[in-house]
């Protein structure tokens, strides 16, 4: 997963159950949410209820994308179209105008637990035919008619300890796998990520040795932990983190932390905070550059002079211009 959540430009939907032979469609994220909301909700509902429900649908979808729930299991899509697993999506389905306008307004806002960064797995059901521990769609209508605002409706169902992230950056959905195997001698943030995840998995599978210290270096301790993980989960025990091992670690780690459940253990900022080199230069690439771009894009919501910057992971001309502008407007006057 990316270090910090972003709203994907596009999302890939499987039009059926995960193992069915149904086709995939890749659509803009906003179009996906508009379609889901138009098939899950009634446009005549109070606006507060619509906004609360749409916020839950956004958070649900972003959780699937951020945790790579399906991709870590070997599927080539982000979410399914069926309410048996996810939320209703009808390819080519109609969209209601008022729902479309609400989505345009809030598509990059989502729910988190206080202190956590991952989009909340905002489970919901209709509250009449089916019941669940999350939001009741028809119940939200009653709350809205009683005068509750969207945030109060969400608090009623998900607890008082939720926050809303507003205006999250929009970027392409980039797979978390670094694109090359990690092995003895590898170095970087991807190595550190694997070390941290294996150490958390150790709490549930104590046979996997603890990696200490956690660093950016793929050392003997890391290799030993990877081999034991591979043995436990029936992978080739080569001690190398290729794509299959990377995503199996991701799947198990997401499972033990319950990140794709309403009662999530949560993911804090310190858990994903990358270690930074002292200097980044024009032409540099990698997750550190993406992180700087994320903060520059975030700053743009508060500093109108800040030029837009895409999360490309490449220190390019746009990134350089954004850095110059940031320094110009934030550096103390001499």
What are these model-predicted stretches?
Residues 307:
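Surface-exposed loop/turn segments and immediately adjacent short secondary-structure elements
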Residues 1-279, 285-294, 300-304, 321-328:
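Conserved, single-site charged/polar hotspot
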Residues 329-334:
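Conserved small/polar residues in nucleotide/adenosyl-binding loops
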Residues 312:
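Histidine- and aromatic-enriched segments that form or immediately flank copper-ligand environments
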């Amino acid at each position: 997963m990316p270090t910090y959540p972003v709203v994907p430009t596009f999302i890939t939907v499987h039009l059926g159950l995960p193992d069915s032979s149904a086709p995939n469609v890749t659509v803009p994220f906003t179009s996906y949410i508009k379609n889901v909301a138009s098939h899950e909700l009634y446009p005549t509902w109070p606006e507060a209820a619509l906004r609360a429900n749409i916020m839950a649908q956004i958070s649900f979808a972003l959780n699937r994308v951020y945790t790579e729930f399906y991709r870590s299991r070997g599927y080539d899509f982000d979410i399914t179209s069926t309410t048996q697993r996810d939320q209703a999506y009808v390819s080519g389905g109609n969209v209601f105008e008022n729902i479309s306008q609400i989505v345009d307004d809030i598509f990059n806002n989502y729910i988190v637990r206080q202190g956590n960064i991952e989009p909340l797995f905002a489970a919901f059901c209709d509250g009449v035919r089916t019941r669940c521990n999350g939001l009741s769609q028809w119940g939200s209508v009653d709350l809205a008619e009683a005068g509750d605002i969207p945030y109060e409706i969400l608090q009623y169902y998900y607890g008082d300890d939720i926050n809303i992230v507003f205006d999250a950056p929009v970027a392409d959905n980039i797979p978390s796998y670094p694109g090359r195997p990690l092995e003895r001698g590898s170095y970087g943030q991807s190595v550190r990520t694997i070390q941290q995840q294996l150490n958390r998995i150790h709490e549930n599978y104590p046979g996997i040795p603890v990696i200490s210290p956690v660093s950016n270096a793929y050392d003997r301790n890391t290799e030993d932990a990877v081999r034991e993980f591979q043995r436990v989960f029936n992978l080739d025990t080569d001690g190398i983190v290729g794509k299959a091992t990377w995503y199996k670690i991701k799947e198990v780690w997401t499972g033990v932390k319950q990140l794709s459940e309403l009662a999530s253990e949560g993911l804090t900022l310190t858990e994903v905070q990358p270690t930074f080199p002292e200097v980044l230069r024009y032409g540099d690439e990698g997750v550190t550059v993406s992180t700087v771009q994320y903060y520059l894009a975030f700053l743009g919501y508060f500093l109108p002079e800040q030029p837009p910057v895409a999360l490309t992971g490449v220190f390019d001309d746009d990134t350089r211009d954004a850095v110059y502008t940031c320094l110009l407007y934030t550096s103390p006057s001499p």
